Amino acid sequence: MTWGENRIDLFAVDEKGMAAHKYWDGSNWQPEGDKTENLGGDFVGEMAATSWGPGRLDIVGCTREGKYMHKYFNKDSWSKWEDFGGQFASPPSMVSWGPNRLDIFGIDVNGTLLHQYWNGESYLPEWENLGGPVSCFAAFDFRNVQG
């Protein structure tokens, strides 16, 4: 996942359930060595991450209680964790197809594929039901990047 040239961001859940972050700055991994940036939380499974532009990162993780939690980085600092709620049985997936747009997907405990999005001003009032039951899914975004 990247927000620009020569930048790679990695997110993981450590053995204590906290979100961990490490990034490539074009010449070195930061923080250096085996250290990571601790972003807190109490997660299980994989994190989802995306970027809608330079200096912007969004991550979502699933807590032990099955809630999705969201955090973003905007140029120089991380937000607090935002509770998206839910009773999810899958890790989240997230894509962004443009500035100020996030689409988050997950499977709830009933096997229903759910969708939530940010349109630059607000989220949907409730998770959108995309059908089911399903056991797995993949989300993909495409942006025509011209250089």
Segments the model singles out, each with a brief description of its role:
Residues 1-147:
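A structural motif
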